[in-house]
Amino acid sequence: MNAWQRGLLLALMGLPAVLAAQPPALPAVKVTHRAPMYLDTARSQLGFEVRSRLGQRIEGNFPQFEGRIEVLSDGRHQVHLKMFTRTVEIPGKVRYTGWMRGPDFFDAERHPVVEFDSLPYDPARVDQGGDIQGRLMLRGVSHPEVLRVDKAECARPGYDCDVVSRGTVLRGRYGMDNWQFALSDRVTFVLRARLTGVPEP
């Protein structure tokens, strides 16, 4: 037996010990991709409230809006909302509607979309109520804001009952600082959300 053959034999004899020392293979990881959930715009409502300096509450709504909820790989959710200002209205008040769409308020001609993108959050917050942090883009200006979600009134919020959330912003921070003598600086957005389809198990 020459030196090369002896070396090969020794290597083969030591192979079982090397294999035994190897850590066991990790089990395959099952990656689940869940489709986004979408707002049912026919059954959802998205509006806003602002008060006059005399205490009168002015209520408006966004007839056109859209929203989706992304399900992240770690189970958290992330919501994306769009509100279209060119159709915003104060029901029954043509003059107020024109003013809300005009340059002193939403400035719909230059800024036709208001957007809110949340940070990832635990979906249990929708059941229990709580704050959802995010960022609002309004009139080309972006600031961190908070949506406050009411505690759910049913076992399947978004399907059997509305998910109700509110977010109050200071309009002066977004360049909507005219009419301060007549209107409060606070504008509250109100979302009553229903989802399309059926809940996944």
Regions found by a protein language model. Name each.
Residues 8-9, 13, 59:
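Residues at the start of alpha-helices and the adjacent loop-to-helix junctions
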Residues 1-8:
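Bacterial N-terminal signal peptides that target proteins for export
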Residues 21-201:
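Low-complexity, acidic/polar, glycine-enriched regions of mature
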Residues 12-21:
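Hydrophobic h-region of N-terminal signal peptides that target proteins for export
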